[in-house]
Amino acid sequence: MPSNSKRSMAPPTNVSKQISATSTSKKAPTKPTTQNSIAGAKSTGSPETRTSSPEHMESPETPTATTTVNRKKQKRRQKQAARLAAERQSSNMPAQNGDGGHDIVADFSRAATQGQHAAFDNDDLDYTDDETHYSTQGQRGLQHDKNGVLHQSQEPSKRKGKKKKNRKSRSQSHQAEGSSTSMSTPSASLARPVTLPPLSSSAYRSAHKVTKDRIWNTSTHEERERIKEFWLQLGEEERRSLVKVEKEAVLRKMKEQQKHSCSCTVCGRKRTAIEEELEVLYDAYYEELEQYANHKQGSFENGAPIGAPPRLYQPPLRTLDRHSHHPVAQHPSRGRVQELPDDDEDLDDDYDEDDEDDEPYSEDELEDAARTTRADFFAFGNSLTVKDGILTVADDLLKNDGKHFIDMMEQLAERRMQREEDTQYAAASAAHQSMHAGHNHGPPLDEEEYDDEEEEDYDSQDDEEYEEDEMDAMTEEQRMEEGRRMFQIFAARMFEQRVLTAYREKIARERQERLIEELEEENRLDVEREAKKAREAQKRKDKKKLQKQAKEEERAKREAERAAEEAAQKALEEKRLEEQRRKKEEQRKKREAEKKAQEEERQRKEAERQKRLKEERERQAEFERKQREQKEREKKKREEAKKREREEKEAKERELREKKIKEERERREREEKARQEKEAAAKAERESREKAKREEQAAQQAAAQAAAVQAAKRASQSGPTHLPPGLQHPQGPSALQSPHFQVATPVVPKAPTPIRPRQPSQQGSHASSPRSQPAHVDISQTSSLSPGSVSTTIPGKGVSQAPLLHHPQPSAPLSPLGGVGRGSHTLGFSPMQSLNGLPTNPGTIPAMGPRMPMAHDMSMYTNHSGPLGGQYRGFASPDSIPLPPGITGPRHLGQGRGFQMEVGHTSLPFHPQPNAAGPISAAAPQSSQNSGASLTHTRQPSISFERNQHETQPQSQPISRPAPIQRPASTVPHDQHKDESKTNQQEIDELSTQLGSSALLDDSDIPLTAPPSQPLSSALPPGLPGAGRIGFAGPSLFSDHLGSSKPHFSLGAPGSGAGWAHNPFGSPGFPAAPSWGPSSGAGWPTNAFGILGGSHRAHTSRPVAIRLSVIQACKQLNTTSGTDSSGYHNVNQILRQVEQLNSPNESQIGLDEMLDICDTEGNPQNGGGSFIIKNEGPKGTFVKFEPDNNSISSSTRGSVVPGDIGSPVPGSSLPTPGSGSRQFATTNISPTTGF
C-alpha cells in the first residue's frame, strides 16, 4: 500500500484540473440552467479551451516525485498554464456561468505558487469545478427533434469545416486504441433514460401552424426557463420521487448483468459489497441532493444554475492501474457531462464539432493519451470523448448497458474487500496483487468484440513507451473517492434525465391539450363557416325569390296591357265575327243534338245503375231484416226462458203466500174469538154506564124541555129562526147513529176571512161523491156525551156547561162531538191526560197519545216543517190557533165529519186501553153497529191539498157514484168482504177513468189498456191491503172502515196477539192494536200507513229491477241533457245514474250485466220499450232507450218529467220513514205484475 506521504503529489494534479476546468468555463460562455437539463454542450471558446482534454488525461508529477514523469505531458501542461495565465490577464469579462469561476482562477494562482490544497478545501469551489460545468454547459445546444429526443444544435457552418478533421482524428483514435467501445461509436444497447412516445405527424403539423404560441417555442433559453419554473412548481414529494427512483433501477441492472458471473465465494462477496456500496452511495447522494435542493432554492429562483449536489468527499483524485506493472500517474478526466444521441447522423455532427477540439494537439499526443487511459477502469480513458473541451463521463457509464459502471462498482467492491483484508494482513500491496491474480475475472461482457479490444489495449500498453514511466499510485482512499465522485456524476446525470423526462411529459400533455383545443377551435370555425355559408345561400335564395316575384309582377302587368289591347281589337273585329257566329251557332245546335243524344244514353245507363243499386240495397235490407228477425227470435227464446223461470218463481211465492194467508186466517179466527169474549165483558160494563147516563140525561131533558117551552114561547112571538144544519134538532134516535167510528179529535177551525165562504150544498150532497159524509149531525148527539163520562178521566173538573150552540163559522158544520175536544181552553176542558188510558206527552196537542215505539226506533213524523198538532185533520194545534198555509209540515189529510180518516192518509195508530172511559168510547156502540151501512157515503171535504199523481183516489171529484150500502165489517165474513171491496173498487176505478186527465184525450187518441194503468193496489198479492207508494198514502178507494178485518194486519183488542208484519216498513200497515172501545171488530184500517219506507220493488226479480232502473236513468239523462240530445248516453254514465238510484244495501250492478239486460225485449212487466246499443270504438259504447206501447212512459201514470200531464207537483211528495235511497222518490215505474 502506498503511504499517505504520496498525497503531497496530488495538489498539482487537482490544480491543473481546476485550471483546465476554469479555463473551459471562462472561454466557453454558457447561460444559467437548471439541473434538469441534459449535457449537450456547444463550444464557442478559442482553441486553447480544447487543451483541457489532453491535460486531463495525464497526471503531472512534482519535481519531488519519486516516480518518473512524462516530460512531454509536463511540457504541455506548462505551456497550457502559461497560455491560461495570459488569457486571464487579458480577459476583463467575469465568468458568465455563475459558478464562481473567477474565484477558482484566483485560488489556482495561489495554489500554483504555494502548492497547497486551497482549491479543494472549499466545497463550493469543488462543486463548481465539475458539476457546474456539467450542468451549466449542458443545455446550450439542446433542441428537440420530432420524436421528442434531444440533440445538439450545431451550427451548419462549423459542420462542413470540421468533418474532415473529425474523421481523421477518429481514425487515428481507432488505430491507436483498437477499441470500438469508445464514446465515438455508440453501442446498440445504449442505456438511455425513458423518453416520451413520439407525437404523431399530424399533431406536429398542427403544432407548427401556431409557432407564436409559447408551448411550441423550442428555443434553448426559454426552454431552460420553463424547466426552471417546472422544478419550482414541483412539491417536496414529487422531487423526492424523481430522485429516489434510480436506486432500484441500478440495483436491478446490476443483478441482471451479474446473472452469468462467477459463483465463487469471492465474487459473491464482491456482489454483496457492490450492493452495499450502492446503498451507501445512493443514500448519501439522496440526502445531499435534498439538502442542496433546499439550500439552492433561493439561488434557483434568482436565475443561478443548479448543478449536481456537493460531493461527499474532495480528496485529490488519482488513478492507479492495478492491472499494469508500470503504473502511470493519471488524472481522471472530468468535465461537463454531455448526452450523445442515438442516431448516427447526430453522432457525425458531434464529430464534426470535435475536429476543432483536436487542432491544438498532435496526433501523437492523442495516441499517447489514448494509450494511458487503458491503464485502469477508474481512469475512464477508453470511454472518454472530447466534446468542445468537455469530457463526458456519464455517457460512458451508460454505454454497453452500464457495463462500465458495473465494472467501476466492482472495482469499488474489490477495494472495499481489499481494505478489509489489509486490516487482517499487513502486506497490503502483495496481498492485493496475489488476490487479484487469482480472481481477476469479472462478469462476462455483453459484446465479445469489446472484450477483444480491451485485451488488445492492455497488451499494447505493455509494449508501449510508457513502460519506462512510472505512475504514482494513488492510495485506496483516493481511488474510492474517485469512484464515489464518478458515481455522483452518474447519479446526477440520471437524476437530470428523470427531471427532464417529467418535464417532457408535462410539455407533451400541454401540447396534446393545446392540440385538442386547436382541433376543437377548427371544428367550431368549420361549423361557423358552414352556418355562414347557409345564411349566404338563404340570402341568395331570398334575393332570387324577390327577383322572381318582381318579374312575375312585371309579366302580369304586361299581360294586362296586352289584354286591354286585345279587347280593343275584339271590339273592332266584332262586326267581322258576326257572320262567323251564325255559322258557329248552326254548328253548336248540331253539337247540342249530339250531346243530347249522349245525355239520354248516359241517363239510361244511370237509371240502370240506380236500379242495380236499389236491388242491392233491397237485398241488403232483406239480409239485415233476416238477421234482425233471427236476433228477435233469439231474444224471444231468452225472454220465454226467463218468463218460465219467473212464472215458476211466482208459483212458488204464491204457494208460500197462500200458506201464510191460511196460517194468518187461523190466527185471526183465534184472535176474533178472544176479542168477542172481551167485547162481551166490555158490553156489560158499557150497559151499566149507559144506564147511569140515561138517568142523567132524563134529568137534563127535563131541564131542556123547560127551556124549550120558554124558547117556544119566544119563538112564537118572534117567528121561526133558521138554524144551520149542524144545529138542527135530531129527527129521531137514528140520527144519533154514526156510520164511522167517532174519534175524539176536534176539527181544526178555519180562519175567518172577509169574503163569504162557500156554503156547502144540502141538496144532493150525499150523492155527489163516493166519499161524501153527512152534512149535519143533530145537536142532541152532543148532549149524549154526558159530563159524567168525562169525569172518570178528568176528575175534579166540572163539565156541566151548556152545549155550544153557535159555531165560530156559520158555513162550517159543527163536529158530531160538539164542543168536546175542540180546544183545551175553549170549553174549560184541561188538556186531556189520556186517550182511553194512554198517557199523553206534556206540551203536545190535547187528546193525542205519546209517540208509539216503532221498528228500529224510527221517527214517526218525518220532515216536520211546522209545530206538531197541525199535521192531521181533526187534531187541533195548541189553543186552537190555526196554522198558516204552507207551514203545515206534511200535507193535511182530507177528512170528513165523524173523523173518518182516509186510508193511506190516516194519522197515528193509537193503542187505547180496553176499559178506559172517555168521550170516544161512549160513541163506540153506535159506530160499531152502523159502520158498514154508510162507510163511503160521506161528503168530500171542502179543503184541498196536493196529492201525489200515483194515488188513484180522485181528488174533489164533483161527480161520483155513491158506494152501495154494506154490512158492518164485524158481521161480514172475511172472504165476502174482500170480494165486495174489490167489486166496489173496480166500479170506482171505472168512474175515475172517465174524469181527470182522461177527459183531455182526443177522439182519435187510443187509450192504452196496458196493465200499468191499473191501480197500484191491484198488483199487491192476496192478503196485503192496498198500499200507497209514499208514506201515509195508501189507496183511498178501499172502503175499509175501522172495524174491518184483513189478514196479517187486524187491529184487535189487547192480547189478541197482533204484532208487526214480517217487514216493519217494507209491507203495508202497522201492527194490530186494540180497538178504541170494547166493540167487536172495531179497529184501525189494516193499511193505515201504507208502505212505510219499503222498496216498491221488494218482490221484483233482479233483471226486471235493473231494466227498470236503466229506463229511469235514461229518462233522467234525457231530461238533463236537453232537447238537442240524440238520446244516446254512455254506458258508464248510465251505470253511475243507476247506482245513484239504487239503494246502498242492494248488490252492485256490473257493466256487462247491465248490457246483457238491455238486450232483453220489453214487455209490460219490465217497463217495455227497447234499447239501442251503439259501439263507437275508442269513444265507448252508447245506449238509447226507445219507448213503445208497453213502456211506462205511455201509461196513465205518466213519466217522471215534471210538467207533464199527471206528473206530481214537486213539493207534494211525502217522504216515508224506512231505509233505502229511493224511499222519497216518486217511483212510478214499478210493474203491476211480475212479482
UniProtKB/Swiss-Prot annotation:
InterPro entries: Fungal_stress_NST1, NST1. The keyword Coiled coil applies. Keywords: Coiled coil, Cytoplasm, Stress response. Residues 1-210, 300-369, 416-480, 517-848, 904-987, 1001-1023, 1186-1235 are annotated as: Disordered. Residues 20-34, 179-189, 426-437, 698-715, 1206-1221 have a biased composition (Low complexity). Residues 517-539, 549-697 have a biased composition (Basic and acidic residues). It comes from the Eukaryota. The keyword Transmembrane helix does not apply. Residues 1-19, 35-52, 759-772, 779-794, 831-843, 924-959, 1188-1198, 1222-1235 have a biased composition (Polar residues). Residues 502-714 form a coiled coil. Residues 340-367, 445-475 have a biased composition (Acidic residues). Residues 70-80, 159-171 have a biased composition (Basic residues). GO terms for cellular component: cytoplasm. It is found in: Cytoplasm. May act as a negative regulator of salt tolerance. PANTHER family: LD36051P, STRESS RESPONSE PROTEIN NST1-RELATED. Belongs to the NST1 family. This is Stress response protein NST1.
